């Protein structure tokens, strides 16, 4: 590509095609900015804006109140001893794995783990052992299976796993496994547990000390109404001096934390997280209503012949549906498997991946009962249209 | 901290204290958003907005034109074979080091390397050998010294360094070392060279193939008028199949690149980079005028008794000054070493770190001759005021 004026016209400002649509993509519902965050975005949009008054350590900046946010508010919010900001949940997971494990060590992942947990372990050059889950429709994870996986690792490698990880909830079915029990099983073998809370921190209450987990990875862009990429990493030192290991400082650059490469998310990403924080805290207190909305929505779709997979009644806004009737329609209509996407799009609804009909996931988080009713009615209309 | 209403009032929307000031902090001048980027910021601010139409690989998204940007425009812009987006220059450097070196290998860094290069090497568990530079006032790096450092590494460890790195320009003096000659010296020993272009890509023309370097790390928030954190990583395969190594895919998740943890900078950060790109390309073509502005500014300050360190005449907007007269004033005035910061602040000028008087750096990039004249006059006024 020659970078002449004609070629450069492909870039510049570009509109977001889904703007103003009702978005039920699980990736999107928890990351919609609050009004305060929208203002912060413009205010702090310039590259390094947050560094205007930095003395050399991002998380100790006093103006704006980064220090207060990271060292006082977030530890309370997550129920941990220490927090740092990262570029996202996957970067939080990699940082923990890379810091506490040696190359070749084993990490235990739940069988429903997000691909980024797998890839983080591969980047850290660790062996992966998965904890199995039950089959369709429950996809249940038995806490005792963590013990089995740990014992198998010890018997096969002669060494305990360096870490165990649980996806809470998992990103396919929205199942919330018994984290407290799993932490307790892992701790019987002195294996620390990392909770991947990309879909929970910022949506629902999560407290590491209450659950007894050692590390929490959260996602700002997924669940904390923040402009991405940004995440949080919380460390609970109840079972070891973990924060000393993970946040160890450079021997040559004494105020720079090695695992964070000195500093991480800055400016608009961090300032939108700070801007949304009051509302994010408050919305986690409203979690009961969100779960009620999810259950109501699930019941409505099931009356139309769709089947919700995973825990039932469901405990999270992320839900996976099997839709044999929509699949059947797709086999005989002109637009084929794209018909559902197009029908929903024509009704201003986005978020079920184009081409999916038989299985798909969606999220009801903060969509609100009115829009959820509209979506339910839309499914009803679409199904009746092709019957 | 109890997260009650009173505590939460510390957060929410916060104003940027330096808004509307003339900012000459080298961190800030190249990261100021263009108008298109400011619009993109609002349009794409929601967490995962860019993923609306993602098929599983960030850099292959067609709508918005991410694929065209990363696979066509940026390779041309950087003079490389492959480009990926990262969270910043430091993350680009770590990705290269972590992917191509083994733990315990040596990396050669220029003696003026940014701390983040040091910390990236420490995170990758590499040994660091520094190439010395000449002393004050030039801080010159002799290309042949890279050969010496490589030979010393081989003789001491029995193994060639895995990588050499040059900071181009360095972040203290704004010196542009002879990258082409250094690349040639490194290649005599088959050692690849990474150019840290955090202060060059997006400000001035940089072409990896022309310079013969193997890797380029650039910074969106520092020099490409982007909302941070975001960076670029360019790979030139002329001397090895480096992109196959660095962008290797997961054996289990076949379309996910391990070293990037699947995907990196998303949404507003990437969309502001795309939005600013046409203007960024054009401004690099105006680099001659920026250098002329820097030289003019340097000469003006030198007539007042300040001394510019580093290359002279200077070749970059980032400049380091020694100011014995301002230091002398600081020893006898009431506000002590904060007097300069306060005097400049009262004149709406920000960017020289609070408390510095004897040595400081600044940047003239895109400040414009009118504002530069105003800054020159302000220094003149301040010096005369305390004489």
UniProtKB/Swiss-Prot annotation, chains A, B:
Keyword entries, A-Z: Protein biosynthesis, Pyridoxal phosphate, Transferase
Gene Ontology terms for molecular function: Sep-tRNA:Cys-tRNA synthase activity
Reaction it catalyzes: O-phospho-L-seryl-tRNA(Cys) + hydrogen sulfide + H(+) = L-cysteinyl-tRNA(Cys) + phosphate
Quaternary state and interactors: Homodimer. Interacts with SepRS.
Pfam families the record matches: SepSecS (PF05889)
EC numbers, comma separated: 2.5.1.73
Cofactor(s) listed: pyridoxal 5'-phosphate
Gene Ontology BP terms: translation
Entry-annotated residues carrying N6-(pyridoxal phosphate)lysine: 222
Physiological role: Converts O-phospho-L-seryl-tRNA(Cys) (Sep-tRNA(Cys)) to L-cysteinyl-tRNA(Cys) (Cys-tRNA(Cys)).
Family stated for the protein in its record: Belongs to the SepCysS family.
Binding-site residues, pyridoxal 5'-phosphate: 89-90, 196, 219-221
Annotated protein name in UniProt: O-phospho-L-seryl-tRNA:Cys-tRNA synthase 2
């Amino acid at each position: 590509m020659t970078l002449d004026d004609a070629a450069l016209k492909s870039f510049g400002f570009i509109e977001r095609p889904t703007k103003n649509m009702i978005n039920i993509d699980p990736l999107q519902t928890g990351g919609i900015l609050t009004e305060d965050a929208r203002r912060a975005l413009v205010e702090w949009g310039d590259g390094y804006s947050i560094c205007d008054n930095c003395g050399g350590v991002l998380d100790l900046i006093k103006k704006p109140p980064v220090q207060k946010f990271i060292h006082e508010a977030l530890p309370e919010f997550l129920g941990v001893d220490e927090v740092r900001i990262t570029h996202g949940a996957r970067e939080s997971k990699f940082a923990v794995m890379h810091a506490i494990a040696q190359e070749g060590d084993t990490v235990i992942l739940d069988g429903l783990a997000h691909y980024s947990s797998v890839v983080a372990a591969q980047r850290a050059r660790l062996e992966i052992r998965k904890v199995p889950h039950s089959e369709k429709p429950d996809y249940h994870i038995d806490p005792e299976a963590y013990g089995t996986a740990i014992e198998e690792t010890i018997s096969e490698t002669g060494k305990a796993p360096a870490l165990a990880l649980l996806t809470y909830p998992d990103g396919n079915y929205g199942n919330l496994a018994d984290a407290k029990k799993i932490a307790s099983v892992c701790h019987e073998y002195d294996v620390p547990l990392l909770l991947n809370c990309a879909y929970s921190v910022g949506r629902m209450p999560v407290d590491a000390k209450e659950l007894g987990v050692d590390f929490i990875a959260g996602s700002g862009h997924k669940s904390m109404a923040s402009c991405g990429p940004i995440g949080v990493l919380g460390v609970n030192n109840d079972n070891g001096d973990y924060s000393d290991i993970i946040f160890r400082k450079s021997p040559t650059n004494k105020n720079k934390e090695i695992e964070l490469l000195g500093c991480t998310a800055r400016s608009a990403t961090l300032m939108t997280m700070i801007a949304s924080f009051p509302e994010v805290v408050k919305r986690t207190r409203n979690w009961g209503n969100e779960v009620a909305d999810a259950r109501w929505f699930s019941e409505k779709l099931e009356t139309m012949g769709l089947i919700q997979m995973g825990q039932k009644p469901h405990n999270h806004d992320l839900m996976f549906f099997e839709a044999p009737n929509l699949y059947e329609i797709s086999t005989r209509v002109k637009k084929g498997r794209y018909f559902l996407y197009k029908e929903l799009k024509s009704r201003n609804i986005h978020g079920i991946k184009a081409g999916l009909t038989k299985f798909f996931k969606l999220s009801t988080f903060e969509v609100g009962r009115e829009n959820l009713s509209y979506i339910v009615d839309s499914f009803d209309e679409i199904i009746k249209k092709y019957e």
